[in-house]
């Protein structure tokens, strides 16, 4: 689901909450377009690591905002996150995409570049994209400490998870 128009229709849309600046929103946008553009391994690698790890985390610690009492929000949330997780696996197994030797480390660098863009934006527009302004309002055992310490902890977790995903996916170690 490329565009979350339900927030526009039901009047919940605002710049502080609905720009596609959360990690899964960025991954979702990439997932919508990656199959329609010439083979781009950088986008694939970003989608593979950030999409799978981000969506996996979202499945286990969901935060569904603006729940309007219908099942649409739940369906949209879980179907979009499921698609973010399954598409890069399908691309790896069936479409000839490959993970390069240091792809896991490159994606960590890309994520930090994205962090450097999103963090100041959060303070400018009073938002919490990528949960960089304050911790998400969910029960998450991996949120350790207050801001900014939980972000530093997540930096370590992301490096470990991307490397583990690389080893599992390729069978290679570095």
Predicted features and spans:
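Membrane-interface helix caps and helix-loop-helix hairpins in membrane proteins
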Residues: 8-17, 37-41, 63-75
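Structural signature of hydrophobic alpha-helical transmembrane segments
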Residues: 12-24, 47-48
């Amino acid at each position: 689901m490329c565009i979350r128009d339900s927030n526009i229709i039901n009047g919940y849309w605002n710049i502080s909450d609905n720009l596609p600046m959360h990690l899964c929103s960025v991954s979702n946008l990439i997932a919508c377009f990656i199959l329609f553009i010439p083979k781009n391994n950088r986008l694939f690698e970003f989608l593979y690591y950030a999409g799978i790890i981000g969506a996996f985390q979202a499945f286990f610690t969901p935060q569904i905002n603006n729940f309007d009492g219908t099942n649409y929000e739940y369906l949209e949330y879980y179907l979009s996150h499921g698609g973010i997780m399954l598409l890069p696996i399908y691309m790896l197994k069936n479409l000839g995409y490959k993970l390069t030797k240091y792809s896991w480390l490159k994606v960590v660098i890309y994520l930090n570049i994205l962090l450097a863009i999103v963090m100041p934006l959060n303070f400018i527009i009073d938002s919490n994209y990528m949960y960089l302004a304050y911790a998400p309002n969910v029960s998450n055992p991996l949120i350790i400490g207050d801001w900014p310490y939980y972000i530093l902890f997540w930096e370590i977790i992301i490096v470990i998870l991307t490397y583990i995903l690389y080893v599992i996916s390729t069978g290679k170690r570095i």
